[in-house]
């Protein structure tokens, strides 16, 4: 008798087995330290290491931008879609997890059948009645971990979607910030253009008066009009760009831009906090997009377990208990108890290679997941390296450009003095004025590029999102 119970004992022991391959995190395909060299200004040195980024509201110092970020996080439609996707995958996980437990259903049925006389054993027609009420339970013995594997896969996909939502949030914060700074820059460029246009118009009027007096040539007049036309074209350009910036911001916000925004602070690096130097390279592994890719990889790994388990028998147990009677009034009388027990085993014998192909597909999907995970790390490393290179060079570039603006201001002032003294023609003044305007535009655009590069670096490092927030 003891030996007869061994097969059942072995089956029960198998219930603790799993055919999911042991998961091993792929080695990160990146350097242990950030790049070094002239462009990076020694930022790859990690002797003094910071461990975390400032949170978004600590990093962005501009009160108006902080107000816009709050509005975007509340109303942005992409963020709402991402949140609904998380809820959807959570529901799918709950559905799959429920498969690991027995089901219990209430059931009631009634059946009346008339048997004609030519089919009746007695030769007389009769009506048979049968009524039944009870409970039905069903359960699949997950001896080889098929259901557990599918549940783990659903869980990892749900977790991947959660991380994807965080990625959307970080991207949204970065997009709102860069669009806001572009809007501010275009406003400054329009203001500069309008001031320059006013100066050009005044110069044109003066040259036209001089031309009537015979002291200026037609060439001087044409040159002055050319500058006026160029400034008018750029005035229209920046007016259009400001409108487009507003449209882009309102799309990101999911609502109109508030009319009572705090007063703008000067557009400079002071609008941002400091991304600490010396952050370790493995901090990238905490980026939500990389964590999402790893959860997708773990989901693919779990699916291999389900594909392997499909080669083995599936055992289902169905049982019912209740009351049955040929008379509705006697359904709950003594002696009307009924029950049934129906175990079922299904063994795959021939499927034209379907199960083998399904396993191959699952293993290939895992390989795809590994490559995707590795690429996400490499992409993140490249984004941070680009940001560090920008940080290491924009300071010198802006310093040189700012000095260039100062030199053109001096050049314009000297040219004006020499014209007033009759030493040079007004063409020299116009040339100096044009170069000054161009250098001032370039300085504003360089300031924008520097600010946006720091925002992108902050975003590339994970946007202040720490694992403890997960």
Swiss-Prot record:
The stretch of residues making up the signal peptide is: 1-16
State the compartments where it is located: Cell outer membrane
This protein's major location comes to membrane
Positions with an attached lipid (S-diacylglycerol cysteine) read 17
Under the heading InterPro entries, the entry gives: OMF (IPR050737), OMP_efflux (IPR003423), RND_efflux_OM_lipoprot_NodT (IPR010131)
Please tell me whether the keyword Zinc-finger is annotated for this protein: no
Domain of life (superkingdom): Bacteria
Where is this chain lipid-modified, annotation N-palmitoyl cysteine? 17
User: Which UniProt keywords are given for this protein, alphabetically ordered?
Assistant: Cell outer membrane, Lipoprotein, Membrane, Palmitate, Plasmid, Signal, Transmembrane, Transmembrane beta strand
Alphabetical GO CC annotations of the entry are:
cell outer membrane
Region of interest (Disordered), ranges: 104-123
Describe what upregulates or represses it: Constitutively expressed; the ttgGHI operon is further induced about 4-fold by toluene and styrene but not by antibiotics.
- Recorded topology in the membrane: Lipid-anchor
- Name a GO molecular-function annotation: efflux transmembrane transporter activity
* Family note: Belongs to the outer membrane factor (OMF) (TC 1.B.17) family.
Q: What does this protein do?
A: The outer membrane component of an organic solvent efflux pump. Involved in export of a number of organic solvents, including toluene and styrene. This is the most important solvent efflux pump in this strain, although it can export AMP and some antibiotics.
- Kindly give the NCBIfam families that the UniProt entry links to this protein: outer_NodT
What is the name of this protein? Toluene efflux pump outer membrane protein TtgI
| Gene that this sequence comes from | ttgI
């Amino acid at each position: 008798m003891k030996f007869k119970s061994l097969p059942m004992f072995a089956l029960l022991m198998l219930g603790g087995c799993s055919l999911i391959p042991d998961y091993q995190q792929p080695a990160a395909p990146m350097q242990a330290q950030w790049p070094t060299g002239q462009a990076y200004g020694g930022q790859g040195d990690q002797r003094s290491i910071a461990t975390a980024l400032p949170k978004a509201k600590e990093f962005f110092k501009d009160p108006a931008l902080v107000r816009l970020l709050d509005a975007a996080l509340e109303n942005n439609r992409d963020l709402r879609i991402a949140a609904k996707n998380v809820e959807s995958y959570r529901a799918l996980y709950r559905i799959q997890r429920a498969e690991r437990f027995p089901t219990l259903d209430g059931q009631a049925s009634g059946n009346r059948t008339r048997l004609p006389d030519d089919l009746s054993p007695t030769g007389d027609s009769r009506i048979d009645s049968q009524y039944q009420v009870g409970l039905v339970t069903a359960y699949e013995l997950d001896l080889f971990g098929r259901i557990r594997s599918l549940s783990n896969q659903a869980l990892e996909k749900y977790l991947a979607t959660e991380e994807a939502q965080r990625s959307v949030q970080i991207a949204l914060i970065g997009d709102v910030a860069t669009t806001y700074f572009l809007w501010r820059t275009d406003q400054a460029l329009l203001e500069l253009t309008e001031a320059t246009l006013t100066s050009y118009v005044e110069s044109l009027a003066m040259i036209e008066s001089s031309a009537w007096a015979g002291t200026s040539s037609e060439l001087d007049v044409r040159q002055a009009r050319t500058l006026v036309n160029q400034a008018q074209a750029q005035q229209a350009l920046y007016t259009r760009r400001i409108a487009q910036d507003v449209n882009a911001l309102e799309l990101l916000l999911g609502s109109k831009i508030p009319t009572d925004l705090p007063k703008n602070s000067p557009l400079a690096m002071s609008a941002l906090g400091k991304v600490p130097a010396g952050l370790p390279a493995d901090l990238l592994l905490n980026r939500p997009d990389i964590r999402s890719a790893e959860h997708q990889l773990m989901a693919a790994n779990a699916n291999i377990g389900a594909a392997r388990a499909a080669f083995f028998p599936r055992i289902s147990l169905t049982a019912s208990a209740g009351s049955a009677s040929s008379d509705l009034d006697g359904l709950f009388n003594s002696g009307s108890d009924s029950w049934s027990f129906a175990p079922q085993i299904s063994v795959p014998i021939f499927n034209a290679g379907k199960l083998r192909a399904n396993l191959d597909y699952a293993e290939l999907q895992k390989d795809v997941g590994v490559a995707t995970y590795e690429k996400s790390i490499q992409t993140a490393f490249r984004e941070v390296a680009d940001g560090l290179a920008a940080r290491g060079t924009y300071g010198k570039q802006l310093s040189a450009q700012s000095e260039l603006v100062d030199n053109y201001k001096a050049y314009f002032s000297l040219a004006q003095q020499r014209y007033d003294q009759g030493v040079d023609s007004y063409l020299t003044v116009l040339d100096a004025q044009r170069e000054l305007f161009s250098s001032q535009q370039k300085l504003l655009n360089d300031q924008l590029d520097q600010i946006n590069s720091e925002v992108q670096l902050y975003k590339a490092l994970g946007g202040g999102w720490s694992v403890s927030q997960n």
